[in-house]
């Protein structure tokens, strides 16, 4: 029966991709690579100096604009809610009653352009920028990266999306 074969194929694929995701991370207890990156608003962010050294837990969403599961996760607003309620006091989009202990970044780690992030081209399902209150970092060649995707490689990203939590 074709339906049973499709179910078995789906289960097999899910299992394979699940095991792949187990290896798409830095080992627990390891020290996350430091970075100094500039967001779409020309603000420079230093992971340790600006955030973890000051006590912030940092969430980093590595995604690709063409990735359907990335888009679904982004539009679930999970990280937006975290940022609005726990982000740095005084940052745009952060509630005045924030716990002031979290920072969130979105990194387009596959070398796609800001135009793609804005919803045009690259197979993107929509506009990633509008309504995103936390910093968005584009890693295409025009943003100063000699090797687009190098930050994703440094962070051992082998699939999209990959979300890291970096603790102080």
Pin down the residues of each PLM region:
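Bacterial Sec-dependent N-terminal signal peptides
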Residues: 1-27
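Boundary/junction segments of secreted and surface-exposed precursor proteins
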Residues: 23-32, 135
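A short beta-strand-turn-helix
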Residues: 35-58, 81-93
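Thiol/disulfide oxidoreductase modules built on the thioredoxin-like
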Residues: 52, 141-168
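Loop/turn elements at helix/coil->beta-strand transitions in domains of secreted/extracellular proteins
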Residues: 53-59, 98-104, 131-135, 159-161, ...
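Conserved redox-active cysteine motifs that mediate thiol-disulfide chemistry
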Residues: 57, 62-81, 113-114
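Well-ordered, non-membrane alpha-helical segments in soluble/globular domains
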Residues: 73-90, 117-123
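Thiol-based oxidoreductase modules, predominantly thioredoxin-like and allied folds used
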Residues: 87-118, 131-146
């Amino acid at each position: 029966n074709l339906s049973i074969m499709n179910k078995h194929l789906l289960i097999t694929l899910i299992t394979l991709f699940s095991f792949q995701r187990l290896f798409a991370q830095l080992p627990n207890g390891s020290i996350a690579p430091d970075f100094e990156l500039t967001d779409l608003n020309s603000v420079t962010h230093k992971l340790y100096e600006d955030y973890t050294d000051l006590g912030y837990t940092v969430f980093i969403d590595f995604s690709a604009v063409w990735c359907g599961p990335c888009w679904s996760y982004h539009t679930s607003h999970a990280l937006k809610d975290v940022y609005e309620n726990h982000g740095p006091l005084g940052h745009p989009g952060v509630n005045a009653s924030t716990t002031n202990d979290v920072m969130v970044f979105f990194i387009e780690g596959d070398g796609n352009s800001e135009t793609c992030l804005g919803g045009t081209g690259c197979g993107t399902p929509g506009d990633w920028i509008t309504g995103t209150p936390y910093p968005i970092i584009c890693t295409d060649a025009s943003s100063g990266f000699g090797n687009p995707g190098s930050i994703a490689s440094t962070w051992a990203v082998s699939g999209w999306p990959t979300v890291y939590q970096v603790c102080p």
